[in-house]
UniProtKB/Swiss-Prot annotation:
It comes from Xanthomonas campestris pv. campestris (strain ATCC 33913 / DSM 3586 / NCPPB 528 / LMG 568 / P 25). A zinc finger (unnamed) spans 3-34. PROSITE patterns: ATP_CONE. Belongs to the NrdR family. One of its GO terms (molecular function) is double-stranded DNA binding. This is Transcriptional repressor NrdR. Binds 1 zinc ion.
Amino acid sequence: MHCPFCQHNDTRVIDSRVSEDGTTIRRRRECEACGERFSTLETIELKLPTVVKSDGGREAFDARKLRTSFDRALQKRPVSEEQIEAAVRAVVHQLRMSGEREVGSLRVGEYVMVELRKLDHVGYVRFASVYRSFQDVADFREEIEKLERELPVGSEQLPLLEAALERAGKPGKR
């Protein structure tokens, strides 16, 4: 590494310390030529893939755009900032772990939908309506019905079912 004081390219490491979170190493160095000391930081560089848009254009992955997508889908929904940040991190992690240099915007959208589905079903349907270009109410209905079919029936749903059966004149099971 070049010395920032005399530009000589021989320096030696005097001390190395790993940061608390284990993602950075601080190295104390000394120049062999002038004797000056300086510090460097070493971090892991994991490059995110380039996003290939549906029109064929390419752009660098932008985590802010990803966050904006989550924010729009979850606007006025009971989802915390921490939950949204965790979902963004999960998508970024998936992209990093893909090991690919390029990823289609459709795949990024699928990753987002997986995370939204875990967080909030209304947010999921909002995002799906834009992502899948819903044309009419039937498209919404179809997506909601698909979501309902895939959801496990929870114990909190049984009282609603019983109440509906009673209103219809059929005795509910107790």
